[in-house]
């Protein structure tokens, strides 16, 4: 890989870095070198994640080398002094021992992001770098990593956690018991980077718990990947053995970091939660006194006593009474109190700083007990105890010596609990009246006469979480995202010292992006999605007409983002009633973002499939939804994005009101906090920036950004857009009439298709071991084509003749449809995820494979005559109608067969040649089922080495292929490998294949052209 010296550090990058990437890596290295913090913005598609990983790990590797040199010198000094030569020699020996044990002076990297999907993407980026052999680990939840069949049957993450803890504590989990003996197994400690799916696969193979095994890797890892909550939650850090001293913290996708910090310090408790906890304690006490304990909990001695339960019940009853006594002046919106109210409520029930840890430990023991008891009787599994434990942990995490800051940063908001939530409350009251006797005040708590309440303990100062992070003596904190601007207010809110700032421009040229504000629709109706106008049928109709006209012009994928789900649903209903929906569907099939995970995954796959049709597709989604936050719509998947409105938070929401009030109260000239209104506007604009970032994904990408809300003309609103977008709008952005925009948009795409490089195979890309997408058994994959409506320019007509097409040609790796399917964890078959899915990036979706043609795809006749031996034909699609659907189900692949190609000696009767599966996943599964494990491992190794690009590697690959696949019954797989080779090696491959046929077949064999 090319090496560049950046800020004095040699950095290996998969290709020659662009200037924006150099600038970014320089800032990262300076932060690490000086032990300072940085806030770095670089637009989506500029290679931010790749630059971040390469720069940080290059610096770590340099420090490791320096450390090794220091240890060698120290060892040499110790030898010169001789054994027992005095205090100096002993000190050197001690220092050397400590240095070896603690990797003395070499920091480690913690890479945190919002979701595991984003972490998987980062790990895939790391796999294609020169630092792929550095020690890494990813931390996941039990829900993702547990392989115990009984635990996985549990509904809800908390139940899985508690049952897992129970089995580990009782030493009845065989998977966890094998961790100690299997943790040094080569498959687990090997050099390859393992993501969540890889950990599960190895765990299943070794019958070892992936969850607990991953923790064994943390201490020795150079880089640890984890979600935000593992890092920001002190309890999670302790549970996962995460030490932050002398650590580099990288917070990627940090545009939501303020909210995440606030939410991690906030908590809620309901009256019904307390009532059900009382009922659960009462039930356990009844079991104790009735002699049922052995039947319910087994013969093991309990970790708690009847006195413990009595005391806890008294405390819970007092807490319930205290909550009931809180006055709610406004039953509709609730009443706000100072933060001190929470401490007063807990104090009345004798929950204090002094006994918090003891009570939390008791609650955890009770949860374990109920998990066992639930195996023998119908009973709740202690969810309310978990809620109480979280409440005490979060509230008392704020030390007594900072209570003045707590009172400024927190508020208590009390709401009336809905009546349908009070069933548990009334049930608890009955339980108290009929349950364990001896406490005369049980029936006098007054719960029946008081309205149940929700007590919210809300944090409005994100600096609280960041301050706790800095207090752990971390070396550096780097916050980065594509949409951090404006940086000053962000830094002010987080209250951390920042030495390095960066707002990178985009990597694309101005001519590759078309940005316009559309203030009126085709009928000159104002487009403004404010509260007053959202129910205006004229506005909704005009917006639909706008989308229809844009859909007629934009090729391939069109994304439409709405401010909220209610607005999306309102527009869909209106357009379906008026016929606009059908009109848009005639131009492009429409997909709507669903909320369910399974539906979402299948909808995305259908959308990506529809893009392969010449008409493309429309995807309607919501700002801040799943589509806007993590998916890649590069190249044809997204040629334009329409923003239909600004997604402001609900103005009357109590939390929004209190956040604005907090900013206004604490804002000074010195701290540069935003005003309440500025924060309100910025929250909406950042969501817009994220949605816009789905489209332009790499240097050769192009697309249009259409802001269909007249409020985007406001200077204050424009200033909060990303810097690279502002450059396209000018100093005084104004909306243009709809007619000229349509003409300009048509001209933009015509020019882009004529001048821009269309997606092609990326030769230098390194193989990735992605989890393969498993397709449904029995369905025929639609062979994609790149064809356009009649009248489009020659670029697409020429592209349609190509033998191999791919969807993405980014020099900067980003999400693809296959990546999305694996990140979502969706597998339709039962095959385990395959770490050897090294083919997933060697090419992409194939539209036409001619195994016999080595001529140019651009030649007039296609380069192959009628004597072609094996050809898989494209199926042209004209419309998504019923006829097409039937064709999809019934049309089989057609093959041209030559009489002199045989898989094995047969009679003279015509036989159809077996063809390698088209899907990479199916190809790998079939290959693995036919060869030994050692052969498959050798096959994977040489294929990975082949990607380094030398002819020697090609020879090694051919040697293994001929050894493994040369037999007549395996010949179809040998031929199928051709599509995964680089173009310069295909001719030689054809020669080898022809020679193989001549040597093993008795009949003459024509060389494949």
From Swiss-Prot:
Lineage: Eukaryota, Metazoa, Ecdysozoa, Arthropoda, Hexapoda
Chain ranges of the Helicase ATP-binding domain: 7-322
Protein name per Swiss-Prot or TrEMBL: Regulator of telomere elongation helicase 1 homolog
SMART domains (alphabetical): DEXDc2 (SM00488), HELICc2 (SM00491)
Binding site for ATP: 42-49
Residues at which [4Fe-4S] cluster binds: 146, 164, 173, 209
Alphabetized PANTHER family for the sequence: DNA REPAIR DEAD HELICASE RAD3/XP-D SUBFAMILY MEMBER, REGULATOR OF TELOMERE ELONGATION HELICASE 1
Pfam family, one: ARCH_RTEL1
């Amino acid at each position: 890989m090319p090496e560049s010296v950046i800020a004095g550090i040699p950095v290996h990058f998969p290709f020659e870095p662009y200037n924006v990437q150099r600038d970014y890596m320089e800032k990262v290295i300076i932060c690490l070198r000086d032990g300072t913090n940085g806030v770095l913005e670089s637009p989506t598609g500029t290679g931010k994640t790749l630059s971040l990983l390469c720069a940080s790990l290059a610096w770590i590797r340099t420090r490791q080398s320096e450390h090794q040199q220091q240890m060698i010198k120290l060892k040499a000094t110790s030898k010169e002094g001789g054994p027992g030569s005095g205090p100096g020699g002993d000190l050197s020996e001690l220092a050397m021992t400590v240095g070896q044990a603690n990797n003395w002076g070499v920091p480690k990297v913690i890479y945190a992001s919002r979701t595991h999907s984003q972490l998987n993407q980062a790990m895939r980026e790391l796999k294609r770098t020169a630092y792929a052999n550095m020690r890494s680990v990813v931390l996941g939840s039990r829900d993702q990593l547990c392989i115990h069949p009984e635990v996985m049957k549990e509904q809800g993450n908390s139940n899985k956690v508690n049952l897992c803890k129970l089995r580990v504590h009782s030493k009845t989990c065989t998977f966890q018991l094998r961790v100690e003996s299997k943790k040094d197994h080569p498959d687990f400690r090997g050099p390859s980077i393992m993501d969540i799916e890889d950990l599960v696969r190895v765990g299943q193979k070794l019958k070892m718990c992936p969850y607990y095994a991953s923790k064994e890797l943390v201490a020795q890892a150079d880089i640890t990947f984890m979600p935000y909550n593992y890092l920001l939650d002190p309890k999670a850090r302790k549970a996962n053995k995460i030490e932050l001293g002398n650590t580099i913290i990288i917070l990627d996708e940090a545009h939501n970091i303020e909210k995440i910090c606030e939410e991690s310090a906030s908590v809620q408790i309901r009256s019904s939660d307390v009532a059900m906890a009382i009922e659960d304690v009462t039930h356990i006490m009844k079991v104790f006194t009735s002699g049922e304990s052995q039947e319910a909990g087994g013969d093991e001695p309990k970790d708690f006593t009847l006195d413990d339960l009595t005391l806890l019940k008294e405390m819970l009853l007092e807490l319930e009474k205290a909550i009931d006594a809180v006055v709610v002046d406004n039953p509709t919106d609730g009443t706000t109190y100072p933060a001190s109210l929470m401490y007063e409520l807990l104090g009345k029930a004798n929950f204090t700083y002094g006994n918090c840890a003891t009570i939390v430990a008791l609650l955890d023991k009770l949860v374990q007990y109920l998990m066992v008891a639930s195996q023998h009787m119908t009973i709740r599994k202690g969810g309310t105890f978990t809620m109480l434990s979280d409440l005490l942990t979060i509230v008392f995490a704020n030390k007594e010596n900072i209570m003045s800051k707590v009172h400024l940063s927190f508020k208590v908001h009390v709401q009336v609990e809905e009546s349908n939530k009070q069933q548990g409350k009334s049930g608890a009251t009955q339980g108290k009246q009929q349950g364990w006797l001896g406490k005369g005040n049980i029936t006098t708590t007054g719960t029946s006469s008081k309205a149940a309440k929700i007590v919210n303990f809300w944090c409005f100062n994100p600096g609280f979480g960041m301050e706790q992070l800095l207090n752990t003596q971390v070396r550096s904190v780097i916050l980065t995202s594509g949409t951090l601007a404006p940086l000053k207010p962000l830094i002010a809110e987080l209250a951390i010292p920042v030495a390095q700032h960066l707002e990178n421009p985009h990597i694309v040229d101005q001519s590759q992006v078309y940005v316009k504000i559309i203030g009126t629709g085709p009928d000159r109706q104002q487009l403004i999605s404010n509260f007053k106008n959202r129910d205006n049928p004229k506005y909704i109709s005009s917006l639909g007409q706008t989308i229809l006209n844009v859909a007629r012009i934009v090729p391939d994928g069109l994304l439409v983002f709405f401010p909220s789900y209610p607005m999306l649903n309102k527009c869909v209903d209106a357009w379906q009633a008026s016929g606009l929906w059908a009109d848009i569907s005639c131009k492009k099939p429409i997909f709507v973002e669903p909320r369910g995970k399974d539906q979402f995954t299948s909808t995305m796959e259908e959308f990506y499939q529809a893009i392969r049709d010449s008409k493309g597709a429309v995807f309607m989604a919501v700002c801040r939804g799943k589509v806007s936050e993590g998916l890649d719509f590069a190249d044809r998947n997204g040629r334009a994005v329409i923003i239909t409105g600004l997604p402001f938070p609900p103005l009357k929401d109590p939390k929004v009101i209190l956040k604005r009030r907090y900013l206004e109260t604490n804002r000074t000239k010195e701290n540069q906090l935003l005003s309440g209104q500025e924060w309100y506007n910025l929250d909406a604009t950042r969501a817009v920036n994220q949605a816009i970032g789905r489209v332009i994904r790499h240097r050769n990408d192009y697309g249009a950004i259409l802001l269909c809300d007249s409020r985007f003309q406001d200077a204050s609103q424009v200033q909060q857009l990303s810097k690279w977008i502002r450059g396209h709008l000018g100093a005084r952005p104004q909306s243009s009439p709809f007619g000229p925009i349509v003409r300009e948009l048509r001209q933009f795409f015509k020019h882009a298709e004529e001048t821009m490089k269309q997606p092609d195979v990326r030769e230098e890309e390194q193989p990735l071991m992605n989890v393969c997408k498993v397709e449904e058994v029995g369905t025929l994959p639609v062979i994609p084509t790149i064809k356009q409506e009649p009248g489009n320019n020659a670029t697409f007509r020429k592209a349609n003749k190509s033998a191999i097409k791919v969807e993405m040609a980014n020099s900067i790796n980003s999400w693809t449809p296959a990546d999305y399917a694996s990140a979502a964890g969706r597998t339709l078959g039962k095959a385990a995820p395959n770490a050897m899915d090294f083919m997933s990036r060697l090419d992409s979706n194939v539209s036409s494979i001619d195994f016999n043609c080595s001529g140019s795809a651009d030649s007039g006749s296609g380069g192959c005559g009628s004597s072609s031996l094996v050809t898989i034909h494209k199926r042209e699609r004209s419309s998504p109608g019923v006829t097409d659907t039937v064709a999809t189900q019934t049309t089989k692949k057609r093959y041209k067969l030559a009489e002199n190609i045989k898989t094995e000696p047969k009679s003279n009767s015509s036989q159809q040649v077996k063809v390698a599966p088209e899907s990479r996943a199916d190809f790998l599964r079939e290959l693995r089922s036919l060869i030994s494990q050692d052969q498959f491992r050798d096959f994977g190794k040489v294929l990975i080495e082949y990607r380094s690009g030398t002819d020697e590697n090609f020879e090694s690959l051919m040697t293994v292929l001929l050894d493994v696949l040369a037999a007549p019954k395996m010949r179809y797989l040998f031929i199928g490998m051709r599509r995964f080779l680089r173009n310069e090696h295909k001719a030689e491959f054809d020669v080898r294949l022809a020679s193989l046929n001549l040597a093993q077949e008795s009949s003459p064999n024509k060389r494949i052209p």
